């Protein structure tokens, strides 16, 4: 387990307007001894949103040691090359694990905003700046190990998922039989993206309130709302999120009360320390008072 520093990555997406719905990826880079890449959906993972989706992704996650985890904070900025003040910035943080290795923003910016605000697209290029801060790493990747060019996927109820995700996806369908009864997306890339986001969301909501920040819960709410709009039936997950928000409120309330009680207790603690000090002094005086007198001390001194 280790704490690492942050790194800033700039990714220039060329010929943006000609890109289709398939996901695109930045070059792989290393932060904190871990491989990362930025993943984007030029048309969004839900066409109804008409948006640009942006995520941080762990590549070659199948090659990572069992039990690996990494906690990262990412800040994505879409650079407005005409005016820096108009640049769009969003921040999130997430525990990346074997079954939830992608996290970010289904709606980083809408196409309407991209086209309306002059300066984002210059000569057909969109500039993305990502600041990645790896907060904690459990189980390091050997970055010298070559990545496998082919990643095997398995079909589970019409979704192409990685072997490490199969059990989690099967459990989702077993416990929620109608989860995709009204799911609208047909594009296989977009379906995979939605499933990855859903798995990341379920992993997030399984964390303790202590591990989750209010910003993290807010991000989870945005991701959940987005997934619901694709037609996924996630009533049970909404309930889970509400319960987690309530537990977070209780946790914060308890912390406030504990701090208040501790502040109230401080004067008494100081008083107790003062009394203990007085008791020690009194005991010393008591021992001195109980010392027997020697009748010969004065005689010896006079001789």
UniProtKB/Swiss-Prot annotation:
This is MATH domain and coiled-coil domain-containing protein At2g05410. PROSITE patterns: MATH. Residues 6-132 form the MATH domain. Signal peptide: none annotated. Residues 227-291 form a coiled coil. The keyword Zinc-finger does not apply. The keyword Transmembrane does not apply. Disulfide bonds: none annotated. SMART domains: MATH. Keywords: Coiled coil. It comes from the Eukaryota.
